[in-house]
A protein has these predicted regions:
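Small/aliphatic-rich secondary-structure junction motif
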Residues: 19-71, 142, 151
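Structural beta-alpha unit
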Residues: 1-22, 91-119, 126, 135, ...
Length: 152
């Protein structure tokens, strides 16, 4: 297992990285929602990635509230890095963690994903609409293939 940790310290520019666009290896993207749901999504993404010979990208849109500068998140980046390294250790395949400091997590997730990406989103099991289900629906409408995993 190899882990690459990238920190993006600005809002998404609306385009995937040029270096990533040229890579040929299939990518399964997991969008962070909450720890429990993301762990469930990572397990499903790990199984998919193993069977497809793909790698996993964990996209973490961290919302920074307006009173704070975008480069000054309320949670220390070192803490976030440790937390996501621990989550990434659960996967049997290569994982690339991308942390985006942003104002709107849905817009950031839409902006940083390559067109027609395979995305796994974890969420809570509820009868009413949740933030996670809204994210999955938004990404589907944007043209991505989305798998929603319900966490217990």
């Amino acid at each position: 297992m190899r882990l690459t940790f990238n920190q993006t310290l600005s809002t998404a520019a609306g385009h995937p990285d040029a270096a990533e666009s040229q890579e040929q290896k299939l990518n399964v993207t997991v969008v962070f929602t909450c720890v429990k749901a993301t762990v469930a999504a990572m397990k499903k993404a790990g199984a998919l990635a193993e069977s497809l010979g793909a790698r996993i990208t964990l996209v973490v849109p961290q919302v920074v509230p307006f009173p704070l500068e975008l480069t000054s998140p309320p949670v220390l980046l070192e803490f976030q890095e440790r937390r996501f390294r621990d989550i990434a250790k659960l996967s049997p395949v290569e994982i690339n963690v991308k942390l985006y400091l942003c104002r709107d997590e849905m817009e950031t997730a839409k902006a940083v994903l390559k067109p027609h990406s395979l995305v796994v989103v974890g969420g809570r099991r509820r009868f009413w609409p949740t933030r996670e289900k809204a994210l999955a629906r938004t990404l589907r409408k944007a043209g991505h293939e989305v798998i929603f995993i319900e966490a217990e």
